[in-house]
């Protein structure tokens, strides 16, 4: 039976919209997460706002989830997300992209970084005690192979957390109402999303790979999704800044970002919503 709400103290919430409290695994050493952090500002000072406010929501979820060590990050990218989300280093970050994973060294969020395909992990079976993949799996064409390999390197009953867009990521696009499916297909391509699926599809994928889906909840409302959509266009100046200076934000200060933060904060709620455009999953290795 899959629980469709975020975890509460007993991990079985019956209160819709309840934000998960902090949990621990008795007797298991794990990664200590950042508490009482302003994740929205921390993300805004480094990223374009349309990426920052979604990542801030996702950072908040990990504060409530146990991550017994060693921890495996599938698709760590440039390491920015982990550096802001966790107080202690993640044991291993794996990514196939040469540029981002070498940039991850600068953030210092990992004990070890491995440049490799997620479907060909160099680690022995049942090596890791927990794993996560933050907004990565939707970009992987060979998703079944990556999930199966992730299951192989996780210990029995190890938790695996991931978040991905669902079907409403595409169906709630505002410009599609005027330009039709051609725009939807184009947006899917520029955002490199191969899988925008509902929980039943993910449950089947997980089962084939050797996981059991434990929980999920939808988040990021349709209105938030449309702010993200338009941010791709309003964020063009940030792209120019990045190309010229290597930074997304020239003045990452409170006074420079307060108006942006004030605007996006109303769309950056971590509360689960039934028609959310993204879904957070908790799975367990069988």
What annotation goes with each model-predicted range?
Residues 130-141:
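A short SAM/SAH-binding and catalytic strip from SAM-dependent methyltransferases
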Residues 15, 177, 215-286:
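A C-terminal cap/extension of S-adenosyl-L-methionine-dependent methyltransferases
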Residues 2-124, 130-132, 273-280:
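Conserved N-terminal segment of class I S-adenosyl-L-methionine
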Residues 183-201:
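Acceptor-substrate binding/catalytic loop of class I
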Residues 202-217:
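A SAM-dependent methyltransferase catalytic signature shared across enzymes that methylate proteins
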Residues 140-145, 172:
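Short N-terminal helix/helix-N-cap motif within the alpha/beta-hydrolase-1
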Residues 161-184:
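Conserved class I S-adenosyl-L-methionine
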Residues 144-159:
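A short glycine-rich, Lys/Arg-flanked "PGG" loop and its adjoining helix->strand segment in the class I
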């Amino acid at each position: 039976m899959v629980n469709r709400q975020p975890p509460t103290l007993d991990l079985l919430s019956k209160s819709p919209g309840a934000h998960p409290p902090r949990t621990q695994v008795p007797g298991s050493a794990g990664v200590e997460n950042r508490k009482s952090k302003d994740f929205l500002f921390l993300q805004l000072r480094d990223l374009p706002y349309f990426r920052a406010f979604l990542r801030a929501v996702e950072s908040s979820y990990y504060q409530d989830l146990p991550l017994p060590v060693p921890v495996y990050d599938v698709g760590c990218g440039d390491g920015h997300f982990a550096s802001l989300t966790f107080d202690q280093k993640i044991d291993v970050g794996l990514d196939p992209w040469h540029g981002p994973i070498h940039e991850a060294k600068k953030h210092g969020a990992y004990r070890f970084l491995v440049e490799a395909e997620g479907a060909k992990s160099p680690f022995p079976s049942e090596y890791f005690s927990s794993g996560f993949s933050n907004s990565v799996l939707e970009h992987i064409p060979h998703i079944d192979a990556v999930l199966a390999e992730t299951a192989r390197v996780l210990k029995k009953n190890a938790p695996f957390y991931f978040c991905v867009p669902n079907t409403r990521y595409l169906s709630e696009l505002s410009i599609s109402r005027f330009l039709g499916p051609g725009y939807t297909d184009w947006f899917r391509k520029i955002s490199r999303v191969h899988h925008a699926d509902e929980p039943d599809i993910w449950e089947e994928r997980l089962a084939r790979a050797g996981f059991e889906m434990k929980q999920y909840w939808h988040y990021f409302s349709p209105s938030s999704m449309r702010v993200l959509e338009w941010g791709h266009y309003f964020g063009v100046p940030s792209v120019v800044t990045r190309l010229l200076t290597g930074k997304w934000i020239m003045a990452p200060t409170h006074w420079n970002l307060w108006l942006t933060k004030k605007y996006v904060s109303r769309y950056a709620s971590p509360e689960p919503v039934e028609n959310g455009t993204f879904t957070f999953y908790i799975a367990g290795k069988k």
